[in-house]
């Protein structure tokens, strides 16, 4: 077997079935066949069928293959060896490039001529018949490969043109599905909106009924009190009481009136639960940490700067301008001058707490009320079984049926929007009127005073990344 045949056999063994070239980063599939990594992945990508071996078409359990580094090294060596052999043949064929034509003529006379000099006397020569045939075969082989590759490219082009139409049809179908589903969602949300509005209207009617009934009751009580006052004043101004029984009667009639303490009616509104609000808000989740430089000296912060509680004893901390000296307050490290931001705070079973947003320039010294526009906060207050929420500033209260355990804070800086949400049931607690922010804003937190040991739990900033 000639060297050329050996080289050809070696090339066939080290050639990828797909690209018909020497292996490049070869991998071996479950069935034992090897391919270039890029070729195999491209083949699987182009054929939208169950994964199979491109050579034997055996169905594979999955995209499993092993790297075959040794085969890659052999292919690299064979490529270099082939190049050297071809170069050697060219050098042998160029033996006729000699200073004189005598050697070429002598070899030609012996019938073993490898070269024939050109008639113009130049040094350019012809290859021997054997070398010429070898190169002709190689050219034909390359030509055949090029034709195969062109045929493959034409097939892929035809397939891609079909995929263009298919892609357009699939996109059109998906758009129709999206429009249809969002129409259903819009209808669902519209119905939810109507239900919430009806619920609020019913609660408004009930609250108005309570207020009117209490108004009538108080009016009657005032009339009775006025009548009794007039009777007693009239009796006391006379020179002498007509009888002891008259005095006793007046006292007996006044006793029930004295026992009736005027009371204001408690009105309640359900927190507005908005479907899908939690998912929408959490798209704007912002990592919030506490700023130790602003914390009141009585406050204790956790190591991760996510939790704060009232410590009970004053810590030895510098009285820097940023620190709150009277209010049990700490600011968040983050400073906002743009964008939308949302975070949640676990308030747990605390009986008093305050969370919200304030201007970065808010006063840190003293304990005076903050001017309107400097502070946007939500205050939770529990006294006995009575639980209420207050917003500041200006201060405005609202009774709620159940305590809020987790508060969501939302800021849209550009639109001037700040709102508080119940982080447990997605309901809206309060939305401030639209404002125009002209300076930086920061989160603000206050665990408030311990209240004789009933309010010692911490405020904890929740991590939302794992829930999104």
From Swiss-Prot:
Organism whose genome encodes this protein: Homo sapiens
Assembly and oligomerization: Interacts with USP5.
InterPro entries: B30.2/SPRY (IPR001870), B30.2/SPRY_sf (IPR043136), Butyrophylin_SPRY (IPR003879), ConA-like_dom_sf (IPR013320), PRY (IPR006574), SPRY_dom (IPR003877), TRIM/RBCC (IPR050143), Znf_RING (IPR001841)
Record bears the keyword Zinc: yes
Zinc finger boundaries on the chain: RING-type: 16-57
Function (record text): Probable E3 ubiquitin-protein ligase which plays an important role in blastocyst development.
GO molecular-function terms, A-Z: ubiquitin protein ligase activity; zinc ion binding
Domain B30.2/SPRY, residue spans: 267-468
Single GO biological process annotation from the record: innate immune response
EC class (word): transferase
Record's protein name: Probable E3 ubiquitin-protein ligase TRIML1
Reactions the enzyme catalyzes: S-ubiquitinyl-[E2 ubiquitin-conjugating enzyme]-L-cysteine + [acceptor protein]-L-lysine = [E2 ubiquitin-conjugating enzyme]-L-cysteine + N(6)-ubiquitinyl-[acceptor protein]-L-lysine
One GO CC annotation: cytoplasm
Record pathway: Protein modification; protein ubiquitination
Alphabetized UniProt keyword annotations: Coiled coil, Developmental protein, Metal-binding, Transferase, Ubl conjugation pathway, Zinc, Zinc-finger
Any coiled-coil regions, as ranges: 133-158, 184-237
Enzyme Commission number(s): 2.3.2.27
């Amino acid at each position: 077997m000639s060297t050329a045949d050996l080289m050809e056999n070696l090339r066939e063994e080290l050639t990828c079935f797909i690209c018909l070239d020497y292996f490049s980063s070869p991998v071996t599939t479950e069935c034992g066949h090897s391919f270039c990594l890029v070729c195999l992945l491209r083949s699987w990508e182009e054929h939208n069928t169950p994964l199979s071996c491109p050579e034997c078409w055996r169905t594979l359990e999955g995209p499993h293959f092993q790297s075959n580094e040794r085969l890659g090294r052999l292919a690299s060596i064979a490529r270099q060896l082939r190049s050297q052999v071809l170069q050697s043949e060219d050098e042998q064929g160029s033996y006729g490039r000699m200073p004189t034509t005598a050697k070429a003529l002598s070899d030609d006379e012996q019938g073993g001529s490898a070269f024939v000099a050109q008639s113009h006397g130049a040094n350019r020569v012809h290859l021997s018949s054997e070398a010429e045939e070898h190169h002709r075969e190689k050219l034909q082989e390359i030509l055949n490969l090029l034709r195969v590759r062109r045929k493959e490219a034409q097939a892929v082009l035809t397939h891609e043109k079909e995929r263009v139409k298919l892609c357009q049809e699939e996109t059109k179908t998906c758009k129709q599905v999206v429009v249809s589903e969002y129409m259903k969602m819009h209808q669902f949300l519209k119905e939810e909106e109507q239900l919430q509005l009806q619920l609020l209207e019913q609660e408004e009617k009930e609250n108005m009924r309570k207020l009117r009934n209490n108004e009538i009751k108080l009016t009657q009580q005032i009339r009775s009190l006025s009548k009794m006052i007039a009777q007693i004043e009239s009796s006391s101004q006379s020179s002498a009481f007509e009888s002891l029984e008259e005095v006793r009667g007046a006292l007996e009639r006044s006793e029930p009136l004295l026992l009736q303490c005027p009371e204001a009616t408690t009105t309640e509104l359900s927190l507005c639960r908005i479907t899908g609000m939690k998912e929408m808000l959490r798209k704007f989740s912002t990592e919030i940490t506490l700023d130790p430089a602003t914390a009141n000296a009585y406050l204790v912060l956790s190591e991760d700067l996510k939790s704060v509680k009232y410590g009970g004893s004053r810590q030895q901390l510098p009285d820097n301008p940023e620190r709150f000296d009277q209010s049990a307050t700490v600011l968040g490290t983050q400073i906002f001058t743009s964008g939308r931001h949302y975070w949640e705070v676990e308030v747990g079973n605390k009986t008093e707490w305050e969370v919200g947003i304030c201007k970065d320039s808010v006063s840190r010294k003293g304990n005076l009320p903050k001017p309107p526009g400097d502070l946007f906060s939500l205050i939770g207050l529990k006294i006995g079984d009575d639980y209420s929420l207050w917003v500041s500033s200006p201060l405005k209260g609202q009774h709620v049926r159940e305590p809020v355990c987790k508060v969501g804070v939302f800021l849209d800086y550009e639109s001037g929007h700040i709102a508080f949400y119940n982080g447990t049931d997605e309901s809206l607690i309060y939305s401030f009127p639209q404002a125009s922010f002209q300076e930086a804003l920061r989160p603000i937190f206050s665990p408030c005073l311990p209240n004789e040991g009933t309010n010692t739990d911490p405020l904890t900033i929740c991590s939302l990344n794992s829930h999104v």
